[in-house]
Amino acid sequence: MFDIGFGELMLLFVIGLVVLGPERLPVAVRTVTGWIRAIRSMASTVQNELTQELKLQELQDSLKKVEEASKNNLSPELKASMEELREAAESMKKYFKGINSAALDPTEPHTIHNPLVTDPEALHDGVTPAEGDRQAEAPLMAPSVKASAPADSVANPGEPIAAAAIGQPAAASVDAASTSPSAKVSAPADSAANLATQAATPAAPAPAPEEPGRAATATGPASSTSPLNNDR
């Protein structure tokens, strides 16, 4: 490998023996031989890889030459079949391109009132954003209001005022019962009962006025007897 002769090896051995001595010389020889073996193995692996790469390159070149020769030497039937396959592939490509262009560019342009729908849920429901805006802009129907109280008041104008007066304490007692605690519910009920009893019982007759002559006679004897009582 290094083209070293026997005389050169002996010269190196003597120099190493003088420099290193008899104790270090065997260790140095072992290390040098290990390095030489590693270098040889590395060189052999690199050489093998280079040869493999060269062989692969030669095979590729030979395959290219064979393909070119086979193309030139094809029969007319094979050439016609290859051309038909190419035309079919081109037509399929054009068809798919047309479908994609139609899907991306519809006849109606995408404007503010008709934007492009990309949400799958909106596409599934079939509602476009423009239709949703139109439905949102539609006027809301006002709910019908039933005026039942005025109709009842017009239908029954001649109800007695006493019924309203009796109903007011009852309503007040119901409101007090709903808002106040249970301990204060009995007071409005008792007051309503007292009002009902007072309204049911007749009023007592007023005392008749006394005549002036009778009042004088009644007071006269008392005044006459008063001096006698004092004398006694």
From Swiss-Prot:
GO molecular function: protein transmembrane transporter activity
Region of interest called Disordered, as start-end residue ranges on this chain: 108-129, 176-232
UniProt keyword annotations, A-Z: Cell inner membrane, Cell membrane, Membrane, Protein transport, Translocation, Transmembrane, Transmembrane helix, Transport
Similarity remark: Belongs to the TatB family.
Topology relative to the membrane: Single-pass membrane protein
Organism expressing this protein natively: Sodalis glossinidius (strain morsitans)
BP GO terms, sorted: protein transport by the Tat complex
Role this protein plays: Part of the twin-arginine translocation (Tat) system that transports large folded proteins containing a characteristic twin-arginine motif in their signal peptide across membranes. Together with TatC, TatB is part of a receptor directly interacting with Tat signal peptides. TatB may form an oligomeric binding site that transiently accommodates folded Tat precursor proteins before their translocation.
Protein name: Sec-independent protein translocase protein TatB
NCBIfam families for the chain: tatB (TIGR01410)
Listed transmembrane segments: 1-21
HAMAP family: TatB
Superkingdom of origin organism: Bacteria
Composition bias, Low complexity: 189-203, 214-232
Keyword Ribosomal protein: no
Entry-linked InterPro entries: TatB
Cellular component per GO, a single term: TAT protein transport complex
